[in-house]
């Protein structure tokens, strides 16, 4: 069956083929039903005589974890699709916390560039930006600050959208490198043409 995120029983049940006589079974219908499972990107179904079916699933590849505002942790793929998994170790430990409305399985976080940017921030090592940038937490805020990197030292970097993310990250790195001990509440790089920080 080739399943990591979907149990054999769930796939068998979703296919709708259990107990269906071979001459009435529809491989196309079973494939369509299987593709409604959020963790399934595609499926191949073969009806085999005298009375069996062979199901092969192509599952989504988890690139990280997306924690919704209701504390449900979803796996997320590079296209931004959220899905559950029977394998809790089946995704990298990179986490993004979403403070916006709760999410559901199969929902897509748009644009994919936002997912990529958030996971790049989640991959930063403690102390990589500056010595007190530890206990990092990547957050999608509900307000205008958008994508935010919060630190255990109680200061944050505000990135906003994923537009021009590389420039924003470079600007934040440069500012933090040049100000390794400055007391901060926030560094705002939402506009890469101008940096705002507090206290200034």
Please give the residue ranges for each predicted region:
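Short extracytoplasmic
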Residues: 1-32, 36
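Charged, solvent-exposed interaction patches on well-folded alpha/beta domains
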Residues: 10-22, 42-200
């Amino acid at each position: 069956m080739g399943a990591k995120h979907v149990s054999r029983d769930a796939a068998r049940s979703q296919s709708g083929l259990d107990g269906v006589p071979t001459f009435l079974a529809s491989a196309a219908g079973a494939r369509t039903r299987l593709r409604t499972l959020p963790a399934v990107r595609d499926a191949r179904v073969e009806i085999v005589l005298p009375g069996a079916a062979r199901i092969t699933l192509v599952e989504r590849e988890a690139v990280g974890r997306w924690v919704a505002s209701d504390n449900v942790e979803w796996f997320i793929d590079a296209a931004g699709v959220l899905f559950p998994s029977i394998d809790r170790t089946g995704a990298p430990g990179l986490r993004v916390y979403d403070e916006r409305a709760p999410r559901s399985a199969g929902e897509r976080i748009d644009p994919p560039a936002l997912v990529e940017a958030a996971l790049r921030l989640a991959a930063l090592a403690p102390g990589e930006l500056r010595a007190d940038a530890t206990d990092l937490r990547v957050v999608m805020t509900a307000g205008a600050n958008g994508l935010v990197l919060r630190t255990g030292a109680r200061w944050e970097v505000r990135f906003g959208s994923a537009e021009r993310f590389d420039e924003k990250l470079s600007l934040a790195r440069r500012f933090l490198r040049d100000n390794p001990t400055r007391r901060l509440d926030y560094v705002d790089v939402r506009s890469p043409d101008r940096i705002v920080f507090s206290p200034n």
